[in-house]
Structure formats: C-alpha cells, structure tokens
Amino acid sequence: MLKSNNASKTATCKVGDKAAKKVFFRRRKGCPLSVPNAPVIDYKNPELLIKFVSEGGRMLPSRITNVCAKKQRKLNNAIKIARILALLPFVFQAK
C-alpha cells in the first residue's frame, strides 16, 4: 500500500513540474570557425587550440564551443597531434 501511495505522489509531482516549467529556445550562433576570415585549424597553432581546451586540459565539446561537427573533428585531431608533438600539455597543472 505504501508503494502505490509513493508512486502516485511522484507521478503527480512530475506532471506538475512539467507544467510549471517555461521553455525558452535560444537561437544558436553559427560556428566561429566557419565564418569568413576565420583562423585555419592547424596543430602548429597552439594559441587557437588552447581556446578549445578546458582548464584541466580536456577538449571542450561542440555544444559549449558552438563549433560545427566537421570543424570539431578537425580540432580534436589537431589537439591530439599538438599534444603528441609537445606543443600542448596533456594535463594542465593547478596553480
């Protein structure tokens, strides 16, 4: 009896939460690397690559950087090559 009572409470809470939420859709900005005069993605350009790496040294996902899928793949490959050639560190040290 307690299980059904708890289950009905959670079901009503979920419905109430959905009705109370307001959904806002924001228009995504375009890819910053697909615009005219955008910098070329190259493993020899660590200043560009460091913008797409987190403070801990991890590659940032495209949903955060707003980079299109094609450029994201090129970025990931360039970052990996730059790490192997010691142009970028694998892990950033905490200061």
From Swiss-Prot:
Pfam families: Ribosomal_S18. It comes from the Bacteria. InterPro entries: Ribosomal_bS18, Ribosomal_bS18_CS, Ribosomal_bS18_sf. One of its GO terms (cellular component) is cytosolic small ribosomal subunit. GO terms for biological process: translation. The keyword ATP-binding does not apply. The keyword Iron-sulfur does not apply. HAMAP family: Ribosomal_bS18. PANTHER family: 30S RIBOSOMAL PROTEIN S18 (PTHR13479), SMALL RIBOSOMAL SUBUNIT PROTEIN BS18M (PTHR13479:SF40). Belongs to the bacterial ribosomal protein bS18 family. Binds as a heterodimer with protein bS6 to the central domain of the 16S rRNA, where it helps stabilize the platform of the 30S subunit. This is Small ribosomal subunit protein bS18. It comes from Rickettsia typhi (strain ATCC VR-144 / Wilmington).
